[in-house]
Amino acid sequence: MHAKKLDKIATAVLYSIAGIIVAILASLILYILVRGLPHISWSFLTGKSSSYQAGGGIGIQLYNSFFLLVITLIISVPLSMGAGIFLAEYAKKGPVTNFVRTCIEILSSLPSVVVGLFGYLIFVVQFEYGFSIISGALALTVFNLPQMTRNVEDSLKHVHHTQREAGLALGIARWETVVHVVIPEALPGIVTGVVLASGRIFGEAAALIYTAGQSAPALDWSNWNILSVTSPISIFRQAETLAVHIWKVNSEGTIPDGTIVSAGSAAVLLIFILIFDFGARKLGSYLHKKLTAA
């Protein structure tokens, strides 16, 4: 068969495969949005959830999801930055570095439910944090740390070596070169990775069932005592997130309009995850143009 004809056939096959993937993804998104959007209202987004009566909302669960996301990022971003900088800038090739990379690969391949059980045994039981936001945040840190570390490392390695050489040629210390030259250059990629990880954290459920709990106690918005279980800023209270709420309503829910609540909650969750994903790309492009004057 003629080479040009083979090339056209191969191109058509590849386009068809890509089209099928896009069609499946678009169908899934449209199905969730079409089922859920009609049930979303302001009262649904801000109201309290109901255990037995119809008409409950997702206000507390939505707040818990964002609060848990913030706490997780506060813990995981510095750790991933430090690990990524070490691997990209300071680690020498050898058995120790290879062992660290192997550990990162193993952690990144663990199922979230296994990480959840690990978090339950260590943070909930052993450290006696109980079902709490801090237990969930620590478990999600273990879950996302490998991905975020690799993102930081890859972003730093994409910075051209001439940038480092220029800093060292000016007599700047190595750590100052990393902080003032390399990291600003790699910042768009790092920020994009963090925002994408935020979407993954926001939609996680399995790991949180065993660590953050499955209940959402009423919050006293005038109580700013961080140790109180009714305080909205307490990290030692149980916190059912939106993803866990969807799972609970579908598996154990007793409310009469469980299907409606689940559909609306799934649509809200999907919308925020899409915002994180598209926002990461826009923010990365903006920072790249801003910092590189491109």
Language-model-detected regions and their locations in the chain:
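Generic hydrophobic transmembrane alpha-helix motif, especially the helices
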Residues: E105-T141
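Periplasmic/extracellular loop-to-transmembrane helix junction in inner-membrane transport proteins
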Residues: M1-V13, I32-I74, K93, K248-T259
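Transmembrane alpha-helices
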Residues: R174-Q214
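Transmembrane alpha-helical segments of polytopic membrane transport and secretion proteins
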Residues: M1-A18, R281-A294
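Transmembrane-helix boundary motif in ABC transporter permease subunits
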Residues: T72-I104, V125, A280-K289
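Hydrophobic alpha-helical transmembrane segments of multipass integral membrane proteins
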Residues: Y63, F67-I75, L79, A83, ...
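Interhelical loop and adjacent transmembrane-helix boundary motif
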Residues: Y52, L208-L269
